[in-house]
């Protein structure tokens, strides 16, 4: 699958692509788990950078052993915060242009992880989604209300509070 991503990287005229663990809602349990799709890494925190000739996986200390087992054949593993992505990228002989899905990053996370080590190019269509056709895998489920035992308050009471707040604005 990495080879398919590298073809897309070439087609987009970029040097690499950044894949975080999170989804666009920054959920703890991300779906789709794009990082696992591309790296096989199943930990709850991590980020991959796929370059034309190298693959990097950044994980925190809880996951270094797991990352080596699950992804070590195809990725160079780095432990954050001991080594930040910008430190690795600065060692490359040129300043790469990296694509990223702008829905998956905050401005602060881009600055803290990449500083001035690369040129960042937002790409609106997520490249991992293109490879795995992930946009068609979202399954709708019926919504449901949690019981008052769980929420501490009836739904109608919460809706009334929300309604009065919105009326004031």
PLM regions and their residue ranges:
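N-terminal accessory/capping or targeting/presequence segment of soluble
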Residues: 1-93, 101-169
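Ligand-binding face of N-terminal immunoglobulin V-set domains in extracellular IgSF glycoproteins
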Residues: 98
